[in-house]
Regions:
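Active-site beta->alpha loop and helix N-cap motifs at the rims of alpha/beta catalytic domains
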Residues: 1-4, 8-137
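Catalytic alpha/beta core domains of metabolic enzymes, predominantly
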Residues: 121-122, 135-241
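GST superfamily/GST-like fold recognition
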Residues: 253-255
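Flexible C-terminal active-site loop/helix
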Residues: 258-262
Length: 262
């Protein structure tokens, strides 16, 4: 389905605006969003200090209250800290942890296997791998994804590399052991045609029903209609990345009347 990579709204003081956050989540759920991904890239996790990060995860899990699944951003380039956040998210009742590849350190493929194995071993929380080499400088190989998919707690991938040859090879190797979600709103339909499970979506912040409908049409095997709908919103999707995410999407939400802060 369509999981929203939800923004984090802030007050003018720089604190998280939980009152507005709640309204945004209610709107998302009412308009078809299938899951909430909190403290991801779009949620500015890398700009939150530890206390803010943990508070946002805990609050979101409590507020959503099982209406839809909650996926908590728990990744870090520090393996020990990623383990801490993953355990914390599990204690809060998150349904999965989204764990980005270790950035800046630029580890090897063997290092990626060691990093994610340690995280997946720390508790029973399902782990969704997050491949976004344009931000991290690190990219999984298909062989690495295959090795990681053997772990019972690693069962998902947010694919934001844009490399369909890599994805096709990985999906062929991993089969049902790895569920793949697009990390790019302009690639939902082609990825789902290969067997992908949907999208972790920036678009959903401003058009949740549209993102949901695109994925549902794919599930219903109505790919021409899904492609037509995706292309209908291509210019909007493109505009959401005219500057570094989440600047454009927060501006778009502001224009729609949401109080999102800086």
């Amino acid at each position: 389905g369509a999981a929203v990579a939800i923004i984090t709204p802030f007050k003018s003081t720089g604190e998280v605006d939980y009152e507005e956050f709640g309204k945004i989540i209610d709107h998302q759920i009412a308009h078809g969003t299938d899951a909430i991904v909190v403290c991801g890239t779009t949620g500015e996790a890398s700009a939150l200090h530890d206390k803010e990060h943990r508070e946002a995860i805990a609050w979101c899990c409590e507020y959503v209250n099982h209406r839809v699944p909650v996926v908590a951003g728990t990744g870090s380039n520090d393996t020990a800290y990623a383990i801490e956040l993953t355990k914390f998210a599990a204690e809060c009742g998150a349904d999965a942890g989204l764990s980005v590849t270790p950035y800046y350190n630029k580890t090897t493929q063997r290092g990626l296997i060691a990093h994610y194995t340690a995280i997946a071993d720390c508790c029973d929380l399902p782990i969704v791998l997050y491949n976004v080499p344009s931000r991290t400088g690190v990219c999984f190989t298909a062989d690495t994804l295959y090795e990681l998919s053997k772990h019972p707690n690693i069962n998902g991938l947010k694919a934001a590399s844009g490399n369909f040859s890599l994805l096709a090879e990985a999906m062929a190797k991993c089969g049902d052991n790895l569920n793949v979600w697009s990390g790019n709103d302009d690639q939902i339909v082609p990825l789902m045609s290969l067997g992908g499970k949907g999208v972790i979506s920036v678009l959903s912040n401003v058009a949740p029903q549209v993102a949901h409908d695109i994925t549902q049409l794919c599930f219903d095997n109505r790919y021409p209609e899904a492609a037509k709908l995706q292309l209908q919103y291509h210019d909007l999707i493109d505009s959401l990345f005219c500057e570094v995410n989440p600047i454009p999407v927060k501006k778009a939400m502001e224009l729609l009347g949401w109080k999102v802060g800086g």
